[in-house]
């Protein structure tokens, strides 16, 4: 299931997604209420640090979240089981049902990693290897979904 808004960037992405029976493309086609229901039906959330990630976390979904220079102490997803979020910036970390992937490229304005873009600029680069995300998702899926009776 792929979701997104109806802005130009998401609309362009929607055009690039192949038509396949196992891909449900809801980009630009869901209200917030509909997204809550779709998220509740999902097995996991894989995506950026967004409201959707926090919705999935509130529903105790397995989270694979991609962060840029965000201050994870403030914005990482809450683990209901642990009753906490993360407190450290690290390239890859897992706490209970949450795995975070964070870019380790320093902020061009202040040189910090995880400054949270406090300079009102959006000029950050990401150096997260997509393979590391795929590997973590595959490992979880094979251990928890495929092997379940």
What is the role of each PLM region?
Residues 1-73, 79:
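Donor-binding and catalytic core of enzymes assembling or modifying cell-surface/extracellular glycoconjugates
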Residues 25-26, 57-147:
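Nucleotide-sugar donor-binding patch of glycosyltransferase catalytic domains
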Residues 20, 148-149:
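Compositionally biased, intrinsically disordered low-complexity segments
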């Amino acid at each position: 299931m792929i979701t997104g808004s109806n802005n130009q960037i998401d609309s362009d992405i929607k055009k690039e997604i192949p038509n396949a029976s196992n891909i449900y493309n809801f980009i630009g086609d869901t209200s917030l209420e509909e997204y809550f229901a779709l998220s509740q039906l999902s097995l996991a959330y894989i995506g950026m640090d967004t409201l959707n990630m926090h919705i999935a976390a509130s529903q105790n979904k397995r989270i694979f979240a991609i962060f840029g220079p965000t201050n994870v102490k403030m914005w990482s997803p809450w683990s209901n089981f642990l009753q906490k979020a993360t407190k450290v910036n690290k390239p890859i970390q897992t706490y209970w049902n949450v795995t975070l992937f964070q870019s380790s490229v320093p902020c061009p304005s202040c040189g910090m990693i995880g400054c949270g873009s406090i300079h009102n600029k959006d000029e950050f680069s990401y150096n997260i290897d997509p393979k590391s995300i795929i590997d973590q998702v595959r490992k979880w899926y094979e251990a928890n979904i495929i092997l379940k009776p």
